Amino acid sequence: MPKVGMQPIRRQQLIEATLAAINDVGMHDASIVQIARRAGVSNGIISHYFRDKNGLLEATMRYLISHLGLAVKSRLLSLTENTPRARLRAIVQGNFDDSQTNSAAMKTWLAFWASSLHSPMLHRLQQVNDRRLYSNLCIEFSHCLPKDNARIAAKGLAGLIDGLWLRSALSHDAFNREEALSIAYDYIEQQLTRT
């Protein structure tokens, strides 16, 4: 019989083991056996908590998405200046948080994006995440720009965030947060100062 209170601990161990396995060998080669071994549990525990590998991958993506939301929220809550410019910058900072730009997270996100093209469940998660970013950016730009311009600016900044992140992930170099922030901030300034 499982110990009371072990479920959250085991789930976290398995999610962290999944991130580590994907970081080391990729999503395709990250087997249930390998993940269980890394977590120090039996294979059956994965089935018990997640049904199968797909359930574990979904939980891992939800974990990353949750940490992304927390990173953005914490930056928004810590703002001393509550302006659209400051809020846009906070959203960018949250998207470039270490929880999203460390090696394991970046490789898992890349694998997730590729898999979402073939998995309705992962595609749905990706769509929710994309819409949330776009909506948050659009709201902030709409405080300063006409509606159509705000939408275009939001699409541009969302694309820039994803593009900077993707180029770094594919380069195998550590994410250059300062450079990415500088580029994104410059874009925000260009959009907010358009006449």
From Swiss-Prot:
Q: What does this protein do?
A: Repressor involved in the biosynthesis of the osmoprotectant glycine betaine. It represses transcription of the choline transporter BetT and the genes of BetAB involved in the synthesis of glycine betaine.
Q: Which domain of life is it from?
A: Bacteria
Q: Which gene encodes it?
A: betI
Which Pfam families does this entry report, sorted A to Z? TetR_C_6, TetR_N
- Pathway named in the protein's UniProt entry: Amine and polyamine biosynthesis; betaine biosynthesis via choline pathway [regulation]
> Where is the HTH tetR-type domain positioned along the sequence?
8-68
Q: What is this protein called?
A: HTH-type transcriptional regulator BetI
Q: Which UniProt keywords apply?
A: DNA-binding, Repressor, Transcription, Transcription regulation
Among the GO biological process terms of this entry, one is:
glycine betaine biosynthetic process from choline
Which regions of the protein are recorded as binding DNA?
31-50
Instruction: Give the taxonomic lineage as stored in the record.
Output: Bacteria, Pseudomonadati, Pseudomonadota, Gammaproteobacteria, Enterobacterales
InterPro entries named among the record's database cross-references: BetI_C, DNA-bd_HTH_TetR-type_CS, Homeodomain-like_sf, HTH-type_TetR-like_transc_reg, HTH_TetR, Tet_transcr_reg_TetR-rel_C_sf, Tscrpt_rep_BetI
